[in-house]
Amino acid sequence: IYNITVKKQAPKKSEIKQFTKFYKECFIKSSKEMGNDWYAEGDDFLHDKWIEWDDYGYIRGMSLEAKEILTEINLPWFKKIQYFGSVTGNNLKSIDLGNNPTLKYFFLDVGYGESAEEGNYPYLNKIDFSGCQNLEGVYINSVFNIKQIDLSNNRKIKTVNISHTPLDELKMPKTDCLKEFYMNWSRINELDLSNCTNIQKIGIIGCNPQSVTISLGNKTDKEISEFDIDVYSADVETSVRFVANREISEVPKVRYEYGYLGYIDGGLDFLRNCI
């Protein structure tokens, strides 16, 4: 684990180069210990692809691929971070988001060429988002031991995409910011979106149990008719029941397609926004 501490006060210009050099040395050393030889020392690949800095040497964003080295992430070290992401983070045991009012995007994903069945993040069972008041996007893919996610305090969230993560419970905030919600292969059988007053897109793919009830709250027929709803089932039949203070027998514009709207609209676009 490399503990990277940034000074609270803005550093001098001469210190910025020292910070940058230190960050790069840490990640180059991590890559060497992993046996990676695709980089060349002295290249600016860390600045362009992995880490971004602001004018004062603070880390603005980070994307990790170290599979064996990193076991815990403590984001309170990074006082001005805007996004954090990890792929192939199979040994991660904890992610402490701390009180990060600047964090906007968070994602966990599988590594390149890896399948969702390879036991990604086997030790990670909790992520606390409560201190991230400006969080706008969450993308979580193939985290098999997280059973509960609480987003109830994240009232500025715009996109939620949770894939191949067998949740038992998902708590949503009271907000008019959330526009897109996508979920697949969870164990949730009841989902309350009644407090998400401005939601526009919902994507649901094969869940276990195969019947999911989604509460839309006090929505009018006109509001519901303008929803973009995608229900897709691959190996098993998926039944989604929508209720809005009454049972809705037929929701206009529901699309049953071969393909998952959530991955296309929520996943890839979200990752492009982050990196």
What residues fall within each predicted segment?
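Catalytic core of nucleotide-activated saccharide and alditol-phosphate transferases
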Residues: S115-A116, Y121-N125
